[in-house]
Structures are given as structure tokens and as C-alpha cells.
Amino acid sequence: MRVLKFIGKLILSIIGIFIAWLIGVCIFVPVYDFDEPYPFHGEYLHNPYEGMDSTAWLKCNFHAHTRTVGGVANGRNNSNELLDSVYRSFGFDHIGISNYNTISDYGKDNPSYVPGYEHGYGIFKIHQLGLGARKVRKIDYPLWQTLSMKQHTLNKIGQYAELAIPAHPSFVEKGYHPEDFKYLSNYKLLEVLNGYRKSPAHWDMALSNGHLVYLIGGDDSHSMTNINDPANRFTLINSKENEGSQLLKALVAGQAVGVAFPMDPTYTETFPHKRARFEENLPYLTKADLCGDTLRVAATKPLSKAEFIGQGGHVLHVETDVEEASYVIQPEDQYVRAVLTFADGTELWLNPITRHESPDKLYHPRLDHLNYWKTTLLWTAYIAVIGGVILLVRMKKKRNN
């Protein structure tokens, strides 16, 4: 009986410590104030594709998982070697591994290597990619997350990584809300295309409020035995150099295109068939020219549909069955982005043309400011409540004794 009591007390102690840690992590977070954003404005139209070399596209995937933590984490069916070989069979130039909360050094001798990881283990999938990472941010908020929590996480990841990227923002309804991206700042890329979700509403919210945020696409692959895991959502980067720092530099400059390649809804397609379909049907952007106020786009294949999208995600103009599509940017258009769809269903998502006062004023100031007074007041209140609870528990124990 004594042994059972001891085990029971030990289990309760462990549970108590875990709950205390959970509460502490979730409540002792700095409080931020946020300035009101303002949309893009000005006479200068910035085209991230200016000077593009239409022959220099690199196929890149930065979001994929392999076996870690003894196979506990999702990705247990992927060895590093298997993932690498499958992506190389599809002709990928950069094959990134972004395991949960750990940086893989696989392929670190390859010039295109980019150290990265996926941060987050909360129930609402509020995750981030840390690319060019030097260190892993260990702390996350497993339960709810306020806007301050989301901003603080981006800030902290960015201290130890070149890029902090909100991942699959539309994955869970109670995760990232589109409205969050009205105020969130201090990030330069958003995973708009993910193997599980597309997130145009979150991107358009950021762009509509003047945040110069470019897109990235990621398979988020977890199993190389699943035909629909590799080569579905990825990024084409316009760069002559397949070198890690140059890839990140091109992404930040917006010199990239997001790809949504059609999946097999029956899950019966073979890998040889998909590779052949991929090689035959994958289009490449050949033109994204800004001639005065006219945006002209074209690709290596005819366009089944070209959509030009602006403020609030509203479709401004559509053209169908053309070799080249164009749109005259209106004075009231604060930004314009294009989505090109092809006969087989493949989509190319382009980064936006944005308005600015001048070429040297592309980025707006950050909106977040740490409110030391509110933080101190709130933390003092939390400590007082916790202290009061501990005092009541001790008093109750004394009475019982």
C-alpha cells in the first residue's frame, strides 16, 4: 500500500508540476500594443520580378518532415535519404527539412543547405517555419494564443533565424485568424500554399494593410509513400545560384512563384506516372513585366485563366484561354497580384505589385510595441492570484491536520 501511495503521490506531483508549467508559460507573456496599419500608397509601383531571368527557375521545398524523436513525431515514415531521393527524382534543386522543434544537419555540406525547423506544438496548429535558423525557440503556447503571443513568438524566432514564417495559417479555424494579419509584423514571408491548405485570405489581409509580405509554398510532406505528399505545393525561385543564402535573399525580394500542382484525388497514381505528369505539365513564368501602369504576365504554357487580385482579395480582372494576360493598374489599386491557372489545373501564384512613395520606402514600420506598464501590471496580478491560491491550499491543509 505504501508503494502505491508513493506512486500515486509521484504521479500527482508530476501532473501538478506540468500544469503549473503550462499555466506559467501561457500567462507570463509580454503584452504588446499595436499601431493602426495603413495600406500601400504612392505613385511608385514596385515589381519584384523586374530583371527576372525566365531561364533561371529553381524548384524548392522548405517544408518537409523526416523521422525524429524515435519516430514519435509525424514524419516517422521518412528517412532523410528517402525524402532526398524522392524529391531529386522530381528534379528539385533545394530539398529542405523542417522537423518539429529541431534543426536537421542532413545535407549541410550542400551549398543549397538552409538550416530550418517547424516551431510549435499547440493544439490549434499555430506554427512557424524558422529558416536560416541558428537556434530553436523551445517555448510555445500549447493552449490558446492571443495576438501578443503570436507576435512575441515571431519576434523570438526571428532573433535566432533569418526568417520567421507563419506556417499554414488556415490549417485550423481557431489558429491564425485572417484578422491577425492586419496587425502582425516583423515577418517577411507567409506560407500561402501548403500541402494541406491554401491561405489567400490571410495573405490578402496582410497586403491590404500595407505589410509587404511575399509568399512561400511548402509541401509539408510527412510520408514519402503517399503519392500526394511530394511535389504538390512548393516554390519556384528565380536565381542563377543554388546557394542557401541566395535562395533566402531571393525569397525576401519576392523573386519567387508559388506552385499548386494538382493532386490525385483517388490516391492510386503511381510515382512514375506522377513524375511524368510533373515533367510534362509544370509551367514556368516567362513574363511579369510592368510597362507603365500595365502588368503583363505569361508562362511556358497557355493560360487557361489569369486572375488579377487586389485590395481585400477582390478579383479585379479575369482573362481566359490566352497566351498572355494583362491588367491596367488603376490609381485606386493599392496592390495587384496574379494567379495563373493552366489546362491540367496547375496554378502559379505570383507575388504582388505594390504602391509606394518611392523605391527606397518599400517597408512600413513595425506595428508592435512592448507595453511594459501593462505587462508589469498583468504579471503582478497573476502572481497575486497564484500566491492567493497557494495560501488557501496551505490553510486548508492546516485545518485538516
How should each PLM-predicted stretch be described?
Residues 108-112, 159-161, 211, 302, ...:
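Short glycine/proline-enriched coil/turn segments at helix->beta-strand junctions
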Residues 1-52, 224-401:
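C-terminal functional module detector
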Residues 110-111, 184-190, 210-214, 232-234:
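Glycine-enriched alpha-helix->loop->beta-strand junction motifs that scaffold or abut catalytic
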Residues 191-197, 210, 255-258:
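Short, well-ordered alpha-helical segments in soluble proteins
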Residues 25-169, 175-176, 180-185, 193-205, ...:
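A metal-dependent hydrolase metal-coordination microenvironment
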Residues 211-231:
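Short acidic/histidine-rich active-site segments
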Residues 85-87, 120-122, 137-141, 155, ...:
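Glycine-rich loops and low-complexity Gly/Arg-rich segments
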